[in-house]
Amino acid sequence: MEILYTEITQDLTEGLLEISLEELEKNRKVYYIVPSSMSFEKEKEILERLAKGSDSAVFDLLVTRFKQLPYYFDKREKATTKTELGTAGLSMLFRRVLRSFSKEEIPLYFSLQDSAGFLEMLIQLRTELLTANLSVENLPDSPKNQELKKILSRFEEKLANDYANYSEFGDFTSRLADGEFDFQLKDVTIVIDGYTRFSAEEELFIESIQDRVARFVIGTYSDENSLTAGSETIYISTSQMIGRFRSKFPVELRKMAFSSVNEVYNKLTKLLDLDSRFAISDQNIEINSADAKYFRIWEAENQKVEIEGVAKEIRQKISQGAFFKDFTVLVGDPAAYEITLKEIFELYEIPFFYAQEESMSQHPLVIFFESLLSIKKNNYGTDDVVNLLKSKVYTDVNLDEEVIDYFEYYVQKYKISGRKKFTEAFNESEFSKIELVNQLRENLLGNDSPLQVFLGTNRQKTGKKWVSDLQVLLENGNVMANMNTYFSEAESENKHQMADKHEQVWQMLISILNEFLAVFSDEKLKSVEFLDILLAGLKNAKYRQIPANVDVVNIKDYELVEPKTNKYIYAIGLSQTNFPRIKKNSTLLSDEERLEINQTTDENQFIEQLNVVNYQKNQFTVLSLVNSAKETLVLSMPQIMANEQGEFSPVFQLFLNHSDEKILQKIQEVNLFESLEHIGNSRSVISMIGKIERELVETEEKNDDKRVFWSSIFRILVKSNPDFQKILLDLAKDIDTVNLSQETLDQIYGDKLYASVSSFERFYNCEYQYFLETTLGLETFENIDINSKIVGNFFHEVFEKVMQEEALSAENFDEKLTKVLHDVDSNYSRYFTHDATARFTWTNLEEIVRQTATVLKETVSTDELKTLLTESSFGLPKSELGNFSVDDIYLRGRIDRLDQLSSDYLGAIDYKSSAHSFKLQDAYDGLSLQFMTYLDVIKEAFPNQKIWGALYLQFKNQPINLSEINHLSEIAGLLKESMRYDGLVLEEAADQIKAIENITVKKSNIYNQEEFEQLLKLNENHYQHAGQRLKSGQIAINPIMKRSEGIDQTGNVRGCRYCPLKSICRFEANVHMNDHSREIGQKSQAEILAELKGEGRNE
């Protein structure tokens, strides 16, 4: 055995390749072994280096891994019909084994038999024991480990008897030791590169083969001091490994020396070495300004700015002749950076390969199985059924996607949930697409549908039967046909990566089903158990990753770094929390148990002590990282990471303490002093134009020369890029609307406008809202809560029927109310049983009704105010109050109550489920049209009677704070005080109205006859103005905005506060407020009244 070592600043691979070439010249076969985590990249690197020489040399050199070696020497075919279980199959077998135990046998772990996390930990423990050359008998004695021994022993027994799983590598090592391959090995050279430590399994293999081959070489990193310094060294793992080998067999140990060393990386390495040994150097180590060419530390504003900094530098170096493959980006948190990094690199047109394993969990086929399981577990929840159909894997023949949208709309609108409701015909006949939706329901969810045939039973079946039934579902539900279609379409569109994903997922399903049959074929399971087992394998599966192109930027986790990785290295996202990365032991064996095992086992048997190993790994990872670049290394940290303030890691602090100030660079989002070569590409400049312009404005006095530079860049972009020209032209009118044509106006409106009063209040809130909701009839889903329309209708119907009861009096009021509640409840019950929110609302309705009814009871008992009509309509067929129009606008609506004073004055009562009061400002701005319209209708319907006004009555269940009262007897009075009418009253009826109990009239809402007529005229003017706008085809996006309120905490102006249509109009308050809003609330009440008495209002 030869062990060659060199310092990590040197190129170890170069020296090992020289040895490999020497061996190839001797006609020996060279097996070049590298760690599994970097085998692909290492193989590419080695072949590229060897390509400079003779082509024949490559043929006899194989870059491989330890576990692949049996394949090259053992050519025997496996004569077995047994199934070999993969990770998913092993998890299934562990699940089956756990189900075979009683609670008394494994009390600690019995409840975890279906826990995916626990199953994964069992697989991990078994793998660790195999790698450590240990068995379950080596586990320390404790109640927990006694249970683990039972589980693992029964598992190994089942595995050995029924399956083809065995350790090929372990078997190969045993046969090596028996001399079975001596003849094949006599002309073989084995070279091992990149290891500083080996597992027990690997060390046993090395012991068995090292004296049977022509030459056995291990190349590693160390120095003379580390081989004698014990634990005080940065190469501690290497020194321990060399020490073990030298104690077992003869080792030729020698140092490989090279001449060229980049001094800055040598400095960084020395700093780490001194820090690890807590030593102080006699010689001052300083990273000076000249070293900034090779090494820098970035402090970026945030992740986005950090990634853009990398992208700009890559584009700069590409313009100078570099290749994309010369760059490697190392990431501190691959998952957190993935989306942003991909978006920015695509913006800068940088090809890349992101070495982050992608889960199959988002593939439509996996979503289909996930929805199947959720449907069965949650009894056909609305969202689960919709997700199943939206996966577009389970479909009817020629199913139109639009029909799925209709189906989703229907089930969401009518709160369809539960198996019974989905298997029975939908019966809301007013839904225009009811036939299409019912056809889809019948074909895909009906009693005879493939889904129901598969899920319809709750009885247990054997695993074999479940797989057979699933195959029927996949065929009859067109799942197989759809998967083939997806694959073919992706291939035909040259989307080969997507086609490969479709194929991988399908092959994974087949593999899991085969392993399921091998494990659970004769076991009886329920459908939920079957789907849960199946889904566990699918959701944990990963896609194979193969770079699509050679000339790409490689992006990967910084822990996968090795020395001399590439020319240019950018290590980003390195903060105190992840550099170095602190890992906790989350396995089934504690660090103390691992230490106990290692103290009691034989030679070539040891398990990793994670607390020790992780420390050594972190140390070597940092060492590898600072020596990973051949030309330039950048270490970077964002100031804000995951919405938290980032802090420099101890490694950064160490380097900065010995660095010139030029080594640390602040990376900003906009840097006006960047030159032409730093700005990336035209697309990135276009994306930054707004921020650059803002920066120029804020620093106008200091940056006149930079304004000239950037203005020149913008002019060039405008001239050379027609798309950019279009963007600039559209910026000022990105939400401008287009006037409707006369032909369209004739179709949607005709000669006369028919609309409700409330719709015109929406018009004055925002014209575009009126257009979408009233003209186009766009509806939003309504959840049934205390403010929903259904609840409002419920209240109105209850009080309408109560007030219409014959011989109604204060004495029989409660009795008649109870009867009406019972009748109305039966009519509305279907609306209030759809979901939990609706059921909760229903439980509160009676309390609200009864508390509000106390006011009505008072009204019934007084002679001063009597109800003439309830729910009296106008503008509808057979309306009690006839038609009502303003010019050619025909209005419709209902007045909840028409009440008459003892003096014969008439007025209106309007019920509301939320707080309302009459505000002159809202009437002036067109936001409150109801009261004045109702009074105008009454005036027209009863021309010989005078008007007293209009009042609101809110339905509510007023809470009382008991800590604020002295006696319980006060509650009734407080409740009564909270339930009051409020509105506007005419002056001549004010005294009579105020004398009635439960009515509050503010002085500001008492108007004389002249003011009343002016308000009616103002109201009519609002309708006339709206009608003119509508008939002209002018529809503006102009939500109301009160200057004193501005933009609220949700980012909205007042008109958008409760609007669900912003995704359509795309109004953004901070961008469009000044040009696309209508300002209200600018005048006082005195100013409004004065204006009404004058020339009127200018619209």
Swiss-Prot record:
UniProt entry tagged with the keyword Iron-sulfur: yes
Gene3D superfamilies named in the record: 3.90.320.10, P-loop containing nucleotide triphosphate hydrolases
InterPro entries, per database record: ADDB_N, DNA_helicase_suRexB, P-loop_NTPase, PDDEXK-like_dom_sf, PDDEXK_AddAB-type, Restrct_endonuc-II-like
Amino acids binding [4Fe-4S] cluster: C766, C1056, C1059, C1065
Alphabetical GO biological process terms: double-strand break repair via homologous recombination
Cofactor binding note from Swiss-Prot or TrEMBL: Binds 1 [4Fe-4S] cluster.
Presence of keyword Phosphoprotein: no
Cofactor(s) required, per the database record: Mg(2+); [4Fe-4S] cluster
Keywords linked to the UniProt accession: 4Fe-4S, ATP-binding, DNA damage, DNA repair, DNA-binding, Exonuclease, Helicase, Hydrolase, Iron, Iron-sulfur, Metal-binding, Nuclease, Nucleotide-binding
The EC number(s) this enzyme carries: 3.1.-.-
Molecular function terms, GO-annotated: 4 iron, 4 sulfur cluster binding; 5'-3' exonuclease activity; ATP binding; double-stranded DNA binding; helicase activity; hydrolase activity, acting on acid anhydrides; metal ion binding
Its job: The heterodimer acts as both an ATP-dependent DNA helicase and an ATP-dependent, dual-direction single-stranded exonuclease. Recognizes the chi site generating a DNA molecule suitable for the initiation of homologous recombination. This subunit has 5' -> 3' nuclease activity but not helicase activity.
The protein's assembly and partners: Heterodimer of AddA and RexB.
Family the UniProt entry places it in: Belongs to the helicase family. AddB/RexB type 2 subfamily.
Further comment found in the protein's record: Despite having helicase-like domains, this subunit does not have helicase activity.
Protein name (database record): ATP-dependent helicase/deoxyribonuclease subunit B
Organism: Lactococcus lactis subsp. lactis (strain IL1403)
